[in-house]
Amino acid sequence: NLFISTETDTGYQHTAGLVILDAGESRDFCFEKLAAFVAERISPIPQFRWKLREVPFGLDLPYWVEDDKYSIERHIHRIAVPAPGDMRALTELAAYLYSRRLDRSKPLWELWFIEGLAGKRYALLQKLHHCMMDGQGAQRIGEALCDFEADPPPRPIPPEFLGATTGGAPSELQLYARTVGNLPDLMRETDAGV
């Protein structure tokens, strides 16, 4: 994937979206309820459980595999802005969170629940790697997670994200075999100067 191969130690290829939530008169709005809601909404989307598996010796691009240690708790985080909880504090925290590289040992996404905003407001920072889906796909997922009604009916998950599969995690031997099978194409591209 182009977005993986062009990533550097100082230039990451993830995207992010920041949404400010107004709890209004709600007395039971909390991190735990939001985490449960998000878990329910993304559970049918297999890409959120995939991680990259590097090929030995870097002979081929990484492959998507199911993360056998997947747990939503490793992806949804809780943090607070410092007082007074104004927009400056929020943007500084969001910039800091955005500037950190996603952990490649797990699926390449994070969701940050940000507390401490003035006026009984919260923020949600969605961060995912561009190789997972393009910006429009990320926006559609964000829209499926956020509603403007107090008790909305569930929004449908975009159909292009349902039913996808990695085909199972390849073994070391399968990775070597796949890499050897791709070597003639790689050599032709290298020889052609691609």
Q: Where do the protein language model's features map onto the residues?
A:
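M16 family metallopeptidases and their MPP-like homologs
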Residues: 1-6, 11-20
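Soluble acyl-CoA-dependent acyltransferase catalytic core bearing the H(X)4D motif
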Residues: 16-194
